[in-house]
Amino acid sequence: MAVPRRKTSPSRRGMRRSADALKTPTYAEDKDSGELRRPHHLDLKTGMYKGRQVLKKKES
């Protein structure tokens, strides 16, 4: 069975766990509608992505 040669220091353990934290998602304001949306995602209400109509407009 494999056994570590040295004890992992608290500093190294913390550096390894630094990527485990949950980050809040970032939002960008849509230029056309002014709604908040995720960057690099299309707007589901208008169906636009990068100035092009990708989906049909959602009826409300």
UniProtKB/Swiss-Prot annotation:
Q: Which region is the signal sequence? A: none
Which residue windows does the record flag with biased composition (Basic residues)?
1-16
**What GO terms fall under cellular component here?**
large ribosomal subunit
HAMAP family, sorted: Ribosomal_bL32
Give the family per the record: Belongs to the bacterial ribosomal protein bL32 family.
| Presence of keyword Ribonucleoprotein | yes
Residue span of region Disordered: 1-60
A Pfam family that this protein carries is Ribosomal_L32p
GO biological-process terms attached to the record: translation
Protein name per the record: Large ribosomal subunit protein bL32
NCBIfam families from the xrefs? Answer: rpmF_bact
What does the UniProt keyword field contain?
Answer: Ribonucleoprotein, Ribosomal protein
Composition bias of kind Basic and acidic residues appears in 28-44
* Family annotation (InterPro entries): Ribosomal_bL32, Ribosomal_bL32_bact, Ribosomal_zn-bd
GO molecular function per UniProt: structural constituent of ribosome
